[in-house]
Amino acid sequence: MKKMNKIYGLNIDMLRLCYEIKEPNNINILRTREIDEEVDFLYFYLRRIEGKHFKFVYEIRYNDLGIDKLFGELRLGINDDKEDSNFHSNGYAKAWISVSNRVLYSDEIYYLDFIEDNLGLELHNITALDLCLDLSCDVARMIRRLIRNKNVTTFLNTKEVKNRNEDRPEITYITSGNMNKDKYLTVSIKQKKAIKDKGKGTTLTAYNKKAEIANSSGKKYIEEFYNNPGKLHRLEVHLNNDEVKEYLNRTKQELSFYSLIDNRFLNDLFDQTLNSLIRFEYKG
């Protein structure tokens, strides 16, 4: 009997957030510390580290049953000598938190609300977000088959593709493997404005996640999160602030910490982004 394809789940894989500093007392203390100095907040602590693009960068760390863990990074003061870059239009100063990838595959993401509150921060916007759907079927090869199927109409960046012979720089295929054959396929689909700059527009990437873990990232905790499946393929969308903001405005929703743990919100955002990049219709 043929095995059914399995969907393991939709998850956040990358999360960078921008805040308003509502209560600056604790943040002001952080602006006085030197590299490697620590500031204790009872249930978590901050350690200042070197920063390239920001004046103050702190690791957010905590102790979990005797194990020291990294939650993410707090960043203050963009290093561009432009004061406006560090303030929102409403006058509040900016702060940024980047959440560790490992945390996103655990219940520890719930600590974020507590950390925000202790630092006097209020969420303003999502700076960058990766949402991924993990499943057992080779979704990259499935997408390529659909693109090349002449009996299927492809809609690329919401527009119907009518000339199949026209170059499509929005679509790229990357293969990898060993010296004898190509084993893995990665398909990338981008908005035109994202072709040269990932910081603009949305991007879809389909690839073999199990191979990527084994050959590149080494993030075994992702496989463990799904109970070590034999096959693990990923469909991943990347969004920036403008795309998330447009979705929130169109659906008349307000962003909060709870949006980040709301499966319905994440699923709807993923589906809209995916379908805006590419979708298929069988002719007839």
Residue locations for each model-derived region?
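Structured, helix-rich domain cores that form ligand/interaction pockets
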Residues: M1-G284
